[in-house]
Regions:
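Short alpha-helix of the ABC ATPase nucleotide-binding domain corresponding to the H-loop/switch region
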Residues: 160-165, 195
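Phosphate-binding glycine-rich loops of NTP-binding sites
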Residues: 5-6, 135-136, 186
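C-terminal lobe/lid and adjacent interdomain/linker elements of RecA-like ASCE P-loop ATPase modules
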Residues: 168-241
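Conserved ABC ATPase signature
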Residues: 88-162
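Short, well-ordered strand-loop elements centered on a beta-strand within folded domains, enriched
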Residues: 1-9, 16, 112-114, 206-215
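Electropositive, glycine-dotted interaction segments
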Residues: 1-92, 101
Length: 241
């Protein structure tokens, strides 16, 4: 099965035309056991779940919707090296973040807080923005989960546009150790991605999904040679032409 076929199969529930950002590292292509379901994880982050807390006894592997993010963070924060790595990654995206901590309640529910440079008191997750929750979950997915093939649904959904370029850089960095597939409709992702990393997923009249790399098409190559960017072609809906 090719990478494109794997992407189509994993995203078969999606409807309509979508751009897929395939962020891959050449040295690991042959290492990915795409035929093993245990190596693949698909995430569609819902920030409402982590804000509400979770049962302390749940599994520490991050759920597809990141509902158990407090447990995943508790696991990471229990190790000094992992905690430092997490904080460095978080501060790189959110410079005002000074730390994360978890808090267990008497009813065995687990919450997490974030410390910010603006206040001495920790900020409960319930007060954090959806975008901040998403960023924390994305860092966990990219750097602390062990899946070798990761699909992430619209990770930019709650983020300010100014953060997308940095997010794409995080994806590229993390792709040294895992295959990352991002589904998106956002042209900003296309702007910061390499042309060869883009796969266009579309459906025909019968509902079948098809994948193609726009950068391989002669007409798109002509546009690119004339210094018309992939981002402009996507916004003008010319990648399928």
């Amino acid at each position: 099965m090719t990478v494109e076929e794997s992407v189509c199969e994993t995203l078969r529930e999606l409807k309509g035309t979508m751009t897929i950002l395939l962020i891959e590292h050449e040295s690991i292509r042959s290492m990915l056991p795409l035929n093993s379901l245990k190596s693949i994880a698909a995430y569609d982050i819902d920030p409402k779940g982590p804000k509400a807390g979770t049962f302390f006894g749940g599994k520490s592997e991050l759920e597809p919707d990141a509902n158990n993010l407090p447990i995943a963070l508790d696991r990471i924060l229990s190790d000094d090296q992992s905690r430092r790595k997490l904080l460095n990654l978080l501060k790189d995206v959110l410079p005002f973040a000074n730390g994360l901590e978890t808090e267990q309640m008497q009813d065995s529910s687990l919450f997490f807080n974030m410390r910010e440079e603006f206040s001495r008191k920790p900020m409960p997750a319930s007060f954090l923005s959806d975008g901040t929750i998403d960023l924390i979950a994305l860092i966990v997915i990219l750097y602390f989960e062990r899946k070798s093939f990761v699909v992430i649904e619209e990770p930019e959904r709650n983020l300010h546009p100014s953060l997308i370029s940095r997010l794409v850089e995080l994806f590229k960095d993390a792709s040294r150790l895992k295959q990352i597939v991002v589904s998106t409709h956002n042209p900003e992702f296309v702007r910061y991605a390499e042309p060869g990393q883009l796969i266009l997923i579309s459906r025909d009249a019968s509902g079948s999904s098809h994948a193609e790399r726009p950068a391989d098409k002669a007409q798109v190559q002509r546009f690119l040679s004339e210094e018309i960017s992939m981002h402009e072609l996507y916004v003008q809906n010319l990648l399928e032409a």
